[in-house]
Amino acid sequence: MQTLREKIENIRFILLDMDGTMFNAAHRIDAETADVMRQLMDKGYYVAAATGRGLATLQPLLNPLGLRFNAPSVGSAGGEVGEAGCVGSERLFTHAFPREELLQLLRFVLSVGANFCTDGIGRVFVSEAAGTDTYQFKDSRIAKEMGCAYPEVVQLHTETLEQQLGEGEVFKILIWHENDAQRDAIFDFLEAHPGIHGFSTARTMMEALPTGVDKAAGVQIAAEKLGLTPAQCCVFGDSGNDVAMLKAAGLSVAMQNASDDVLAVADLVTDYPNSEFGAARMLQKLFLSEE
């Protein structure tokens, strides 16, 4: 069995979740964190995101600090692998929902009173009842002010759901539920449909993906494009959609603010939460320290 030092010395590729990990409490990257990312890349490490967000939606989050990763990123919780923050750029990998199961799931989510948004290429759909104050609309407005590209954000109306979706691919569905009854009903639906799986990512949020898609599979694809293996990857995460990649990576780090299922599988835990530069401080300690 490898020692911790041996695991650290074997790492060539560092991938970080964004919300709750790389991002601060305001869901933005601090200048200090961006600087650590650049130092790692300057030192020869590959650095990228492994996020539940769609890759094309990251532009307004990366642009203010001029941060550009030097390796393929994992987006939509594993549903896509490609260049982070680039609308219209070629994807190295995508895995979309089967069409009929997608429609059934969206209709069921609405029928129990929950809301959703979808990640795909070209458009982001948000259920009508969720309103226009969700982070997708907020980030879209920020992107417009900055003059950078962002997918079109569209409110999806129940009666025209199928027509509005058109033939566009959907990689991931983020679901907001108000209570345990809604959550349990949606999990029961997922269990009855073998082509879809899901997990909780926060107290009132969950994600649904095509079966076989998760961040671990995405990390493996991104690593292989660089001629590396998951054993040469260090990953950081904080919530349910990070568990698979933490189990698969050579070195796994949970945030201090992580959920219990993440803390249970990680090799290391940061000394500080995401609101106090926890990921950046741990990266400095592991890979940039002179000790």
Which stretches of residues belong to each language-model region?
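Short active-site oxyanion
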Residues: 44-48, 69-71, 172, 231-232, ...
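Conserved acidic, metal-coordinating active-site core of Asp-based
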Residues: 108, 112-115, 119-236
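Non-catalytic pre-domain segments flanking phosphatase-related domains
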Residues: 1-16, 35, 42
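Mg2+-dependent phosphoryl-transfer enzymes with acidic/Ser/Thr/Gly-rich catalytic loops
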Residues: 4-13, 30, 206-291
